[in-house]
């Protein structure tokens, strides 16, 4: 357990990188062009320290380009880290196919006696509690999830680590969490996380139907009443609780303030980036201007 999804993401990526540094192998990391800021900022740090970070291109609908991913992988690639559900668009990435690709690469490297291992990390923060997550089908080595996304207490998150995967800890001390994360364990927050997960399991199907019904109404009513409204992602490839919309002839912040006066909450970007009045990297990667 960790304190946040940001910490889990950092532990996953830095932990893999640092545990293999002594062998001087694995200088290439691959991620997508629409990751959370905790991944993007970390990738910038990796590049400053001599690592090559390759980013997978996106389709116009926001899905990762699997053909491009195959092209980016080389014998020095040590880690692939991809967000499961995008926090801005809600797109669900085809990560079972990525997991299968990683399995094939391992088999190929074994045959060719390539010493660099390859790991697969999934940032499932937005997927957790919204869609079914099957670790075996995903074939991932590491997976991030957190409490507050399922209405549990803030300050608790997890990092799933596949048996046999070695991580160098970020925090050194008393050897808590099997030596991976030293620090006094936040038992109340973790218990709340567990309880929220229990409740979530029983409510997930009901909530999915509720969100789908609301999403369908929004997608029907808005175009009927407003000209120049566009839904950036088809509903069949996203979670229904996230809708990404753009409008002609109105500035984003003005729309946010106007809707707020009517007690309707919207955002011009993710919670982590909405304070910065810059274009969304995720939407730019989809070809939107």
What are these model-predicted stretches?
Residues 1-289:
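Pyridoxal 5′-phosphate
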């Amino acid at each position: 357990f960790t304190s946040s999804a940001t910490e889990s993401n950092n532990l996953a990526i830095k932990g893999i990188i640092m545990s293999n540094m002594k062998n001087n192998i694995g200088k290439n990391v691959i991620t997508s062009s629409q990751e959370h800021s905790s991944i993007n900022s970390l990738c910038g740090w990796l590049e400053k320290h001599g690592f090559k970070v390759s980013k997978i291109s996106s389709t116009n609908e926001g899905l990762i380009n699997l053909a491009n991913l195959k092209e980016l992988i080389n014998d020095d690639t040590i880690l692939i880290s991809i967000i499961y559900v995008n926090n801005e668009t809600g797109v669900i990435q085809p990560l079972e196919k990525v997991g299968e690709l990683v399995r094939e690469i391992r088999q190929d490297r074994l045959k060719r006696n390539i010493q660099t291992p390859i790991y697969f990390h999934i940032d499932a923060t937005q997927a957790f509690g919204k869609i079914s997550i099957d670790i075996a089908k995903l074939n991932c080595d590491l997976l991030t999830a957190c409490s507050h996304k399922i209405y549990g207490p803030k300050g608790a998150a997890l990092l799933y680590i596949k048996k046999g995967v070695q991580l160098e800890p970020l925090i050194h001390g008393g050897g808590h969490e099997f030596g991976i994360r030293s620090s006094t364990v936040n038992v109340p927050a973790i218990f709340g996380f567990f309880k929220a997960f229990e409740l979530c399991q029983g409510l997930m199907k009901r909530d999915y139907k509720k969100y789908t019904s609301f999403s369908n109404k929004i997608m029907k009513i808005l175009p009927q009443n407003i000209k120049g409204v566009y839904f950036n992602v088809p509903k069949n490839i996203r979670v229904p609780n996230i809708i990404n919309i753009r409008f002609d002839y109105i500035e984003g912040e003005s729309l946010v303030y106007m809707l707020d006066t009517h007690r309707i909450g919207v955002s011009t970007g993710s919670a982590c980036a909405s304070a910065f009045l810059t274009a969304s990297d995720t939407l730019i990667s989809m070809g939107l201007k």
